[in-house]
Structures are given as structure tokens and as C-alpha cells.
């Protein structure tokens, strides 16, 4: 095992020397050499599902802005990373090629179905999903609630476009493949790997618009790290897991996020109701609070059977029940430590699974660990 990590460390060192990037795409000095050398036998089987994002972008190498997200295919991504064939038997499939601002429930469904299929057919030992960072935590959170597998599923992206100087995508993809291929990653649910760090989409959130260390865990911490010598998890894998929710084949219901602010009226809530939202998530001030006008409109929505969840626009901390807001009386659900975007995903899945009563929804929000 130690020899394998030493070999991987040496391969990491080759990246700087071998990797050359062009404005129109990726070229590597190592490609011809890799093609001629047969890969080692009995390697873990990794399926890369490509969805687009900055990691699959083209750009001017002199700039990290003005790039075209989703301009590179999954196969081109694999060809851009020397040494992948030494750690796993890897193939790529293209699920979509979009910036993650355009990620949607249809693509989530396609991802989940393909992952389930690959695992049920025993085609793979691990999955890597290349993805934009903007909504990566939402995709990961969704998949973590609908998949039931011990095999690693790892999301990876980049903050710098592929053609820029010192792009972070190739190393991130290499490390994601290492994590997906590692026996240590078994039974850990869906993971996110970027910038030498292993996170859970349950806890991680994007905190910076440009930094390569954008994913942080305000209410927890990372699951582990990847370095030149080893994959280092900070705790053992869980011995028990919550039951996966059914994957809704008919699409996800509409759940709107409304943003609280000073001088807030009821317009956002009323608009959500008028547009047939089945759920409303409040990105509230402080402990998930809002103006009296907004809270009154939310209570009226709850009386109509709409699922109403109080979250917060604050980056850390918990939204607790019945502190400033009378949740029991109003029929609201407290998100605890789930941010608005993850609260929305969970509410969508619960509603699609027929869970709509405030007490049952609240119980589900308390059981996401």
C-alpha cells in the first residue's frame, strides 16, 4: 500500500512538468506515452460521469475570467490528467455539459439512474462526477438522499477554468479518482473532493466566489484530506445509515426560496403560492426570522398545506424551533443546520415521497445525519 502511495506521489509531481493547456482545449505531453503503456491489472473500476462546469471549460490562459463552462468532454478531461490509468481503470460518460447554474432535477434524475444501474450491474467500484461548483453541494445532497450503496460516489470540480495558468481541475480530478478508488472511502456516502480536502455535501457549502478553497464546513469540519502519501480520513466510516428516499420519476415539485431582508413584505410568499409552489423555504434573518407581514403570509401558506421551512441567510449556526417564531402554532419546520438550498432539496424529496405534514417533515430534517 505504501509503495502505491509513493507511486501516486511521483505521478503528482509529473503534473507540473507534463501538463500543457491550450485555449481551445487540453493537450498533454504524456498522452502518447500513456497510450503505449498497458495499465496495471486488477485496478479498481471507476466511472466518470461528466456534467460540465468550470472543470470542463475553455478559456484564455492569461485570464481566469471570461471562460466557456462545459466546453470540454469527459473523455478530454481524462486525457488531460497524466497517471489516472495507474490508479484505476477509468472510463467517462457524458451526462450533460452545462454550467452548474443550469443544473436541474432532470439531470439529477439521470445521474441517479445511471449510478444505480452501474452499481446494480457491478460495473464499477466507484463513481466520480465532474460538476460545476455553484450547485455541487445541492447535487451531492440530492444524491446522498436517493442512493443506497456502500461504493464511493465522489463529486469534483474546479474554481479555475481549464485553460488558465495553474488550473486546479486536473489535480482535483486526480485526487477524486484516488478517493473513489480507495477502500477507505467505502460506506461514507456521497463525497466532494477539491483542493486536497474531502467533504460531505451534508456539511460543505461554497463560501467564496473565486478561491480554490471555496468549500467550507461552517457547522462541522472536513471528512479528511488527500496528500502525497495517503488518503487520510479523520474518523471511521459510519456503521449505520439513514434509509434512502425513493427517487421520484415524475420530477421534483416546485419549492421556492424566499429571501428575508429589512422592510420585507408578503410579496415573495404570495407569489410562490400563486405559482403553485408545494413548498416554501425562508432564507431568514438571524435564527430563521422574518417580518411580521412575511411570517403571517407563511402561516397562511402552511394552512393551505404548503410545506414551510425556516432556514437562515446566515452562514453558520442552527435554526431552532419555537425560539422567536412559534413553529408549533404556525405549522412551520425548522431547518436546524441545513442552509436554504439544501433545505429546498430535502423538502422537494419529502414532498415527492408524500411526506408533507409538518411533524413528519420536521422529523426528516432532524434525521439527515
Give the positions of each predicted feature.
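N-terminal secretory signal peptides that target proteins for export/translocation
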Residues: 1-11
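Bacterial N-terminal signal peptides
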Residues: 13-25
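ATP/NTP phosphate-donor binding region
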Residues: 33-117, 296, 355
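C-terminal non-catalytic interaction/assembly regions of soluble proteins
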Residues: 37, 287-369
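Accessory alpha-helical/coil subdomains and C-terminal extensions
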Residues: 43, 49, 73, 79-84, ...
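Short Gly/Thr/Asp-enriched flexible loops that form oxyanion-binding sites at enzyme active sites
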Residues: 129-151, 290-299
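Short, acidic/small-residue loops that bind anionic groups at enzyme active sites
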Residues: 140-171, 177-181, 303-312
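Internal gly/pro-rich beta-alpha loop/helix module
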Residues: 156-227
Amino acid at each position: 500500500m505504501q509503495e502505491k502511495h509513493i507511486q501516486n506521489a511521483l505521478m503528482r509531481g509529473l503534473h507540473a512538468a507534463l501538463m500543457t493547456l491550450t485555449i481551445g482545449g487540453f493537450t498533454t505531453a504524456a498522452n502518447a506515452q500513456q497510450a503505449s503503456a498497458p495499465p496495471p491489472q486488477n485496478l479498481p473500476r471507476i466511472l466518470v460521469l461528466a456534467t460540465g462546469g468550470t472543470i470542463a471549460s475553455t478559456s484564455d490562459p492569461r485570464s481566469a475570467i471570461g471562460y466557456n463552462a462545459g466546453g470540454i468532454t469527459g473523455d478530454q478531461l481524462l486525457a488531460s490528467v497524466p497517471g489516472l490509468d495507474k490508479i484505476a481503470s477509468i472510463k467517462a460518460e457524458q451526462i450533460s455539459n452545462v454550467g452548474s447554474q443550469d443544473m436541474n432535477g432532470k439531470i439529477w434524475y439521470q445521474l441517479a439512474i445511471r449510478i444505480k444501474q452501474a452499481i446494480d450491474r457491478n460495473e464499477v467500484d466507484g463513481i466520480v462526477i465532474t460538476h460545476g461548483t455553484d450547485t455541487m453541494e445541492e447535487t451531492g445532497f440530492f444524491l446522498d438522499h436517493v442512493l443506497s450503496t456502500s461504493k464511493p460516489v465522489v463529486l469534483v470540480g474546479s474554481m479555475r477554468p481549464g485553460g488558465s495558468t495553474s488550473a486546479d481541475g486536473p489535480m482535483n480530478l486526480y485526487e477524486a479518482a484516488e478517493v473513489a478508488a480507495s477502500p477507505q472511502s467505502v460506506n461514507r456516502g456521497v463525497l466532494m473532493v477539491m483542493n486536497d480536502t474531502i467533504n460531505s455535501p451534508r456539511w460543505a457549502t461554497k463560501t467564496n466566489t473565486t478561491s480554490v478553497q471555496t468549500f467550507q464546513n461552517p457547522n462541522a469540519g472536513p471528512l479528511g484530506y488527500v496528500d502525497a502519501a495517503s488518503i487520510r480520513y479523520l474518523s471511521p466510516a459510519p456503521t449505520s445509515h439513514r434509509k434512502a428516499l425513493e427517487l421520484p420519476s415524475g420530477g421534483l415539485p416546485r419549492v421556492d426560496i424566499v429571501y428575508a431582508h429589512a422592510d420585507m413584505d408578503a410579496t415573495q410568499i404570495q407569489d410562490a403560492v400563486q405559482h403553485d409552489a408545494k413548498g416554501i423555504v425562508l432564507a431568514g434573518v438571524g435564527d430563521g426570522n422574518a417580518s411580521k407581514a412575511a411570517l403571517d403570509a407563511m402561516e397562511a401558506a402552511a394552512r393551505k398545506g404548503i410545506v414551510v421551512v425556516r432556514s437562515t441567510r446566515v452562514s453558520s449556526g442552527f435554526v431552532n424551533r419555537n425560539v422567536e417564531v412559534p413553529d408549533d402554532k404556525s405549522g412551520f419546520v425548522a431547518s436546524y443546520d441545513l442552509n436554504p438550498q439544501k433545505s429546498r432539496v430535502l423538502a422537494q424529496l419529502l414532498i415527492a415521497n408524500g411526506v408533507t405534514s409538518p411533524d413528519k417533515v420536521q422529523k426528516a430534517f432532524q434525521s439527515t445525519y
